[in-house]
Amino acid sequence: MPAREKIGVVVSNKMQKTVVVAVENRVAHPKYGKIVVKTKKFKAHDEENRCQEGDLVRITETRPLSRTKRWRVAEIIREVKKL
């Protein structure tokens, strides 16, 4: 069974070797049918501390690395401009 993958935006990189990635999911409201954007945050392992806030990244599921960390940064799709 292949590992699950998600694409999201880095919202925090304040921890060492860890980033927080916000993943958006669009679902229809069960009763009214309106499309609602739901956001979920995942902690992901970033071994080289390469990710910056605002980067678009792909994360893959992995074995538990800590109490809350079960994802790993697979690649940086789009980097934010550095000042």
From Swiss-Prot:
Pfam families on file: Ribosomal_S17 (PF00366)
InterPro entries in the cross-refs: NA-bd_OB-fold (IPR012340), Ribosomal_uS17 (IPR000266), Ribosomal_uS17_bact/chlr (IPR019984), Ribosomal_uS17_CS (IPR019979)
GO cellular component terms, semicolon-separated: cytosolic small ribosomal subunit
A molecular function (GO) term: structural constituent of ribosome
Keywords recorded for this protein, A-Z: Ribonucleoprotein, Ribosomal protein, RNA-binding, rRNA-binding
Gene3D superfamilies in alphabetical order: Nucleic acid-binding proteins
A biological-process GO annotation: translation
Record family assignment: Belongs to the universal ribosomal protein uS17 family.
NCBIfam families, sorted: PRK05610.1 (NF004123), uS17_bact (TIGR03635)
Biological role: One of the primary rRNA binding proteins, it binds specifically to the 5'-end of 16S ribosomal RNA.
Family annotation (HAMAP family): Ribosomal_uS17_B
Subunit structure of this chain's protein: Part of the 30S ribosomal subunit.
Protein name (Swiss-Prot/TrEMBL): Small ribosomal subunit protein uS17
Originating species: Synechococcus sp. (strain JA-3-3Ab) (Cyanobacteria bacterium Yellowstone A-Prime)
Gene designation: rpsQ
